[in-house]
């Protein structure tokens, strides 16, 4: 045999393939008979072994096994039995044939709070007060906030008075220091409006006048007291003569003048 037949010649890249020969060489896979369920189950591996990309065999496997698998009725199980508890129970039943000891009962599902944790939470939620017993912490905070003894107390350095706010203490200290001084007579006052009313006694200014009798007053408070004399309601009554007065000061003047006891 010539040696040229044993040497492989390189293929010509310009040569076109014969597609008709390739089509004849293809083998057509057709099923001449209906599917055999047992044959498919034996031939197709379970989905855990198959590649996740192979979706068609997985679908066939699931569709064939769905009518055969009996679903577990979880709704009929008690609430305390979880799927883990069911597995433990089945394993203990299988092991009971191998060992002589009776199967242990399934352990109940662990609760979210034990007795010790519940007692500790209850102890943290309540606080003890002398004379009041156990009180919730929220009520205890409110009672402490409302208790004057729990607040900070401000003491006056001139006297023994105590105040709960710094502003009230500052207003009280002005009654000791008397910062408002009259330039005419040197009299001192704790408030500016008191000094202003005092200065009007020197100047003779009376800006507040009565609309009933045209009397004028240097201070507005004196005008209010005067207007009570024009009112019909007289609340202050003399016990001796049954005479009524609109102001307590007028009643005192009446008693000091010497009430005879008869009506006037």
UniProtKB/Swiss-Prot annotation:
GO cellular component: cytoplasm; cytosol; fibrillar center; nucleoplasm; nucleus; pericentric heterochromatin
Pfam families: zf-C2H2, zf-C2H2_6
Spans annotated as Required and sufficient for interaction with KDM1A: 2-7
Region listing for Required for nuclear localization and interaction with KPNB1, NOTCH1 and PARP1, in residue ranges: 151-264
Keyword rRNA processing among UniProt keywords: no
GO MF, one example: sequence-specific DNA binding
Any one of the GO BP annotations: Notch signaling pathway
Glycosylated residues in this chain: 112
UniProt xrefs under SUPFAM superfamilies: beta-beta-alpha zinc fingers
The keyword Zinc-finger appears for this protein: yes
Region annotation (LATS2 binding) ranges: 10-40
Keywords: ADP-ribosylation, Cytoplasm, Developmental protein, DNA-binding, Glycoprotein, Isopeptide bond, Metal-binding, Nucleus, Phosphoprotein, Repeat, Ubl conjugation, Zinc, Zinc-finger
Covalent cross-link Glycyl lysine isopeptide (Lys-Gly) (interchain with G-Cter in ubiquitin), where: 98, 137, 146
Entry's localization field: Nucleus; Cytoplasm
Result of knocking out the encoding gene: Embryos die early in gestation, exhibiting defects in gastrulation and mesoderm formation. Recessive lethal mutation.
Assembly mode: Interacts with LOXL2 and LOXL3. Interacts with FBXL14 and GSK3B. Interacts with BTRC; interaction occurs when it is phosphorylated on the destruction motif. Interacts (via SNAG domain) with LIMD1 (via LIM domains), WTIP (via LIM domains) and AJUBA (via LIM domains). Interacts (via N-terminal region) with CSNK2A1. Interacts with EGR1 upon TPA induction. Interacts (via N-terminal region) with LATS2; the interaction is dependent on LATS2 kinase activity but independent of SNAI1 Thr-203 phosphorylation. Interacts (via zinc fingers) with KPNB1 and TNPO1; the interactions mediate nuclear import.
Similarity remark: Belongs to the snail C2H2-type zinc-finger protein family.
PANTHER family from the UniProt entry: ZINC FINGER PROTEIN (PTHR24388), ZINC FINGER PROTEIN SNAI1 (PTHR24388:SF37)
Protein name as catalogued: Zinc finger protein SNAI1
Species, as recorded: Mus musculus
Lineage of source species: Eukaryota, Metazoa, Chordata, Craniata, Vertebrata
């Amino acid at each position: 045999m010539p040696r040229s037949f044993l040497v492989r010649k390189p293929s010509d890249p310009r040569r076109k393939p014969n597609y008709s020969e390739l089509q004849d060489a293809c083998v057509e896979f057709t099923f001449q008979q209906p599917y055999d369920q047992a044959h498919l189950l034996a031939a197709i591996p379970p989905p855990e072994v198959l590649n996740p990309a192979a979706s068609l065999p997985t679908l066939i496997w699931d569709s064939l096994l769905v009518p055969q698998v009996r679903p577990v009725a979880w709704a009929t199980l008690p609430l305390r039995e979880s799927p883990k508890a069911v597995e433990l129970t089945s394993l203990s039943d299988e092991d009971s044939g191998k060992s002589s000891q009776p199967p242990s009962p399934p352990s109940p599902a662990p609760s979210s709070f034990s007795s010790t944790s519940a007692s500790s939470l209850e102890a943290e939620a309540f606080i003890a007060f002398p004379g009041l017993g156990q009180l919730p912490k929220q009520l205890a905070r409110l009672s402490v906030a409302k208790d004057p003894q729990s607040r900070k107390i401000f003491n006056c350095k001139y006297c023994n008075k105590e105040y709960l706010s710094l502003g009230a203490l500052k207003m009280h200290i002005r009654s000791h220091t008397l910062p408002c001084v009259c330039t005419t007579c040197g009299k001192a006052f704790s408030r500016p409006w008191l000094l202003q009313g005092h200065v009007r006694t020197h100047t003779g200014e009376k800006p507040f006048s009565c609309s009933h009798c045209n009397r004028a007053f240097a201070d507005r408070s004196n005008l209010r007291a005067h207007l009570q004399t024009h009112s019909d309601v007289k609340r202050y009554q003399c016990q001796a003569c049954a005479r009524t007065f609109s102001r307590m000061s007028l009643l005192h003047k009446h008693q000091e003048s010497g009430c005879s006891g008869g009506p006037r």
